[in-house]
């Protein structure tokens, strides 16, 4: 297990069947096999147990912690409202791949939930956006001023609701636009695997065009990490272009290493490596790994399975 870094090759091969990862630190009692396309990686019983005491599932109404309400922007016309525990800071926004966000308020859990409902009802702001839609716009994001303006305008509309359904126990926080484009590596256009390391943004390949649909026994995913947003790793692959791997598809698989070729220089760290279901290393190693994708892929934006790639 190694640290992930932009510009570094990573790769693995899936082995055997995908098994349920269990729930809340407990092994799945059934040892159930789960579908390759499932992003949860759990059987129905373990999924139910995992959500049995969850803020997201509204089963923790008595949670005494302070919560924050946020406004998140993922692309043109793509905004949402959500809540997160104050002690977590912006971790939830990074997990969701929010390109830009601002805090709106802070207070008790139920006041935060009520604010979500008010924004949904009065402003039509959803509380969730499918990852597929987020991926579809990442290669075509506007500049920083337009991104910030979208969040500021939404904040102004939300703040205008004070006194009109806004819970009294929710303290409004000042507008502070946070842009995470650089953290995710999206400020640099993803380069193709064949592009020179010195290529400028204008010389680089366009945004990602394909995504991993599922892993399969013997399937290989390998490439050079160029961006990471939410659960998605953007990998430059041989022949040009970028493949997006939703890391939630990895859970429950045993993973084996793929051949390494050569060494690369030091690059900034972007996060911790991951492990397979049985703790096997994922071969996220700081070496140059040959680009190879041998799993079913789909066109980002709803296209069909790519022919000849599996």
Predicted regions and their residues:
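Non-catalytic accessory segments flanking enzymatic or RNA/DNA-binding domains
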Residues: 1-310
């Amino acid at each position: 297990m190694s640290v992930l870094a932009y510009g570094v090759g990573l790769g693995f091969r899936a082995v055997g069947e995908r098994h349920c990862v269990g729930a809340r630190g407990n092994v799945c009692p059934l040892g159930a096999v789960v579908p390759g396309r499932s992003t949860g990686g759990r059987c129905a019983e373990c999924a139910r147990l995992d959500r049995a005491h969850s803020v997201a599932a509204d089963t923790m109404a008595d949670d005494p912690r302070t919560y924050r309400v946020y406004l998140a922007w993922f692309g043109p016309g793509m905004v949402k409202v959500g809540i997160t525990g104050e002690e977590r800071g912006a971790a939830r926004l990074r997990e969701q791949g929010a390109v830009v966000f601002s805090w709106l308020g802070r207070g008790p859990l139920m006041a935060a939930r009520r604010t979500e409902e008010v924004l949904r009802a009065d402003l039509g702001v959803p509380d969730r956006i499918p990852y597929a839609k987020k991926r579809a716009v990442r290669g075509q994001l506007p500049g920083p001023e337009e991104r910030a303006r979208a969040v500021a305008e939404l904040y102004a509309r939300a703040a205008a609701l004070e006194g009109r359904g806004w819970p009294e126990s929710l303290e409004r926080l000042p507008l502070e636009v946070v842009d995470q484009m650089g953290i995710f590596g999206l400020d640099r256009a993803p380069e193709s695997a064949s592009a020179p390391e010195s290529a400028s943004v204008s010389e680089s390949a366009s945004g990602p065009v394909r995504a991993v649909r599922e892993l399969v026994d013997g399937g290989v995913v390998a490439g050079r990490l160029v961006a990471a947003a939410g659960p998605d790793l953007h990998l430059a692959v041989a022949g040009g272009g970028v493949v997006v791997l939703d890391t939630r598809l990895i859970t429950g698989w045993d993973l084996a290493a793929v051949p390494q070729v050569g060494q690369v220089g030091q690059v900034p760290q972007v996060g911790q490596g991951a492990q397979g279901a049985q703790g096997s290393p994922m071969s996220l190693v700081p070496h140059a790994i040959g680009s190879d994708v041998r799993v079913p892929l789909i066109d980002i934006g709803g296209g069909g399975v790519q022919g000849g790639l599996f």
